[in-house]
Amino acid sequence: MARGHRSQIKRERNANKDTRPSAKLSYARVSVQKACFVLDAVRGKDVQTALGILAYNPRYASTLIEKLLKSAIANAENNNGMDVSKLYIEECYAGCAPTMKRIKPRAQGRAYRILKRLSHITIVLNER
């Protein structure tokens, strides 16, 4: 069955696109569990408060998420023309990425597998 002209299909697909400003960090060298600790602290907060929380958070993931949040703010300002003072974090989540497998030699000829976990971190902003 014909679904319509190619340009019409494209138009319909673009109409359903999410226009909220966002930023995604792929293959971040931090586990999902550790990233979620930091993301839970800033979810739903306005961006200035979130930047303050991230600046004084001692976890390694907070530095990655702080840079990602600044990128999302810049996207909102430049691409969407939004006011920075009205922005807040609507969604933030971390998903699994491929795991790097490494071998650590142990006693009596054994080899233990070390899993270096990666994650994909996404932040979506919106205006209040």
UniProtKB/Swiss-Prot annotation:
Arranged from A to Z, the UniProt key words for this protein are: Ribonucleoprotein, Ribosomal protein, RNA-binding, rRNA-binding
> Does Ribonucleoprotein count among this protein's keywords?
yes
Q: Where is the composition biased (Basic and acidic residues)?
A: 9-21
The yes or no answer to whether the keyword Ribonucleoprotein is present is yes
GO CC annotation: cytosolic large ribosomal subunit
Membrane-spanning ranges: none
Question: Record's InterPro entries?
Answer: Ribosomal_uL22, Ribosomal_uL22_bac/chlpt-type, Ribosomal_uL22_bac/org-type, Ribosomal_uL22_CS, Ribosomal_uL22_sf
Q: Which domain of life is it from?
A: Bacteria
* Any one biological process term the GO annotation gives: translation
Q: Which CDD domains match?
A: Ribosomal_L22
Q: Which Pfam families match?
A: Ribosomal_L22
User: Which PROSITE patterns is this protein grouped with?
Assistant: RIBOSOMAL_L22
An MF annotation (GO) of this entry:
structural constituent of ribosome
What ranges does the record give for the region Disordered, renumbered to this chain? 1-22
Write down the PANTHER family for this protein, in alphabetical order.
Answer: CHLOROPLAST 50S RIBOSOMAL PROTEIN L22-RELATED (PTHR13501), LARGE RIBOSOMAL SUBUNIT PROTEIN UL22M (PTHR13501:SF8)
Q: Which family does it belong to?
A: Belongs to the universal ribosomal protein uL22 family.
Could you describe the subunit structure of this protein?
Part of the 50S ribosomal subunit.
Q: What is this protein for, i.e. what is its function?
A: This protein binds specifically to 23S rRNA; its binding is stimulated by other ribosomal proteins, e.g. L4, L17, and L20. It is important during the early stages of 50S assembly. It makes multiple contacts with different domains of the 23S rRNA in the assembled 50S subunit and ribosome.
- Stored HAMAP family: Ribosomal_uL22_B
Can you name this protein? Large ribosomal subunit protein uL22
- Species the sequence originates in: Lachnoclostridium phytofermentans (strain ATCC 700394 / DSM 18823 / ISDg)
Q: What gene, per UniProt, encodes this protein? A: rplV
